[in-house]
A protein has these predicted regions:
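N-terminal basic, amphipathic alpha-helical segments
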Residues: 1-119, 132, 312-318, 330, ...
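Generic structural signal for small/hydrophobic residues in well-ordered secondary structure
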Residues: 51, 95, 134, 148, ...
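Residue-level detector of anion-binding/catalytic polar loops
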Residues: 64, 171, 192, 252, ...
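Short glycine-rich anion-binding loops that position phosphate/pyrophosphate groups of nucleotides
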Residues: 100, 223-226, 286, 414
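Conserved core of the PLP fold type I
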Residues: 119-249, 261-274, 434
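Conserved core segment of the aminotransferase class I/II
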Residues: 280-343
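Conserved glycine-rich beta-strand-loop-beta hairpin in the small C-terminal domain of fold type I
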Residues: 343-354, 362-375
């Protein structure tokens, strides 16, 4: 029979499937309360143990969470839904995407000739000359490069590592606010997110210490160009974080240096300085093009073996054609000059909007990268208000776990000449919002 909650089923599997279907379809939204075990058991005519088993399976899969006396509720970002942004309305200036400016990307031209002969893809999955380039790229910035591997992008690599290292129900420390696709990925793997607060210098050491006390088995962070907040590790913050992390040598530290060359900040890596388990991940999508689904990683020996062992059982290797293209671009003098120009351009655009907002008394954060985070009282009011002025920005809800509200503005394609108008419109919207919602 169906209950007032729309839940049906006579077996644990059937009940769990019914709840999952309701969450997927939206009839049970994020943080909606599920009925107590005994009440649902009575309504369905089954034993409490059957309902408890269904709830346990739903928790394992990241669809619901238990809040002590607060009962069982749908997860804030359930694994069967997505934090994908809404479609951009026609006629608006889109500052929500976080993508690089296409005019600052090189042309992607396939190599004119591939080396002849049969390639031993499984025995030699990585081009030796690309490995050498990667070591020369990452090593001088202080990351140990004895062990290097490749993957089909940062999310692919991080997801593979977490699935090998952790089990459903394990806890992962994640930046808050943080990159929404990573948050979705962790939830989809059935892992529990432990939010870690960030500021302009990245992860806060006190918040990391709290996450370690909560029993996290991995920590995922960005050393610079933190998305969406824009923070980057200072030298002092790096040392403070290492002091905290060295106390838990079994925790895997995953460093996602996604913007590297165009972040506008130096790398202060947590890797290779007393940590036992670590991986430093880099992609090229922000400065060579989003179609290049390739990532390089430097890591400890154990992490390398576990990652490559799982990769071998799935896709096996990253396309050598793709590796050839990446190698060609990373070693091309003209491309390197374009990347340098892109980094300078993004820094100029980011600084221009920060200055214009600050000049109007609007607090904003963006020490590095392509995004600004602006704290607000009401995300919907600000997003819709800016829409009326012709701008489309990202509501912060999809980036947040427990942090205060805000909006993300991508500055990658925002010319400095437009920054003043956006800041003026933002100030007007904030004034209207405070008048409407009581300040």
């Amino acid at each position: 029979m169906a209950t007032q909650y729309g839940i049906t089923g006579t077996t644990a599997k059937g009940i769990a499937a019914s709840v999952e279907r309701a969450v997927t379809e939206g009839s049970l939204g994020p943080e909606a309360a599920l009925p107590p075990v005994r009440r649902l058991a009575d309504d369905l005519g089954v034993s409490p143990g059957t309902v408890a088993t269904a709830y346990k399976e739903l928790r394992r899969r990241g669809i619901v969470v238990t809040r002590g006396r607060g009962g069982t509720v749908v997860a804030p970002a359930p694994a069967v839904t997505s934090r994908r942004p809404p479609k951009v309305p026609e006629g608006l200036r889109d500052l929500s995407g976080g993508h690089p400016d296409p005019s600052l990307l090189p042309a992607l031209v396939p190599p004119s000739r591939l080396s002849p002969g049969v390639r031993a893809h499984r025995s030699m999955p990585r081009l030796a000359r690309l490995e050498e380039v990667v070591r020369d790229w990452i090593g001088p910035e202080g990351v140990p490069v004895e062990h290097v591997t490749f993957a089909h992008g940062a999310l692919d690599l991080i997801g593979r590592l977490l699935s090998v290292e952790l089990r459903p129900g394990d806890a992962v420390a994640m930046e808050d606010p943080g990159y929404h696709h990573l948050l979705d990925l962790v939830t989809a793997l059935g892992l529990r997110i432990v939010p870690v607060a960030v500021d302009d210098e990245g992860l806060r050491p006190d918040a990391v210490r709290g996450a370690l006390r909560a029993g996290v088995r991995a920590l995922v962070c960005s050393p610079r160009a933190q998305n969406p907040y824009g923070g980057c590790f200072s030298a002092a913050r790096r040392e403070a974080l290492l002091e905290v992390l060295r106390a838990e040598p079994d925790v895997l530290v995953v460093e996602n240096d996604h913007a590297s060359e165009v972040s506008g900040a130096p790398l202060r890596s947590l890797t290779g300085d007393g940590l036992t388990r670590w991986v430093h991940v880099r992609t090229v999508s922000k400065f060579l093009g989003t179609d290049l689904r390739w990532a390089a990683a430097a890591c400890d020996a154990t992490t390398l073996a576990r990652h490559d062992g799982r990769l071998l059982l799935t896709s096996g290797w990253v396309s050598h054609l793709l590796q050839e293209i990446v190698h060609g671009l990373l070693t091309d003098v003209a491309t390197r000059a374009l990347v340098t120009a892109a980094q300078e351009t993004y820094a100029l655009r980011r600084g221009a909007l920060l200055a214009e907002l600050g000049g109007r008394g609007i607090d904003a954060h963006g020490a590095s990268g392509m995004n600004l985070w602006v704290p607000v009282q009401d995300e919907s009011a600000v997003v819709n208000g800016l829409r009326s002025y012709g701008w489309w920005v990202a509501a912060g809800a999809r980036f947040r776990s427990s942090s205060p509200p805000g909006v993300r503005i991508s500055v990658a394609a925002l010319a400095p000449a437009d920054a003043a108008r956006l800041a003026s419109d933002f100030a007007a919207v904030l004034g209207e919002s405070e008048a409407t919602y009581g300040g």
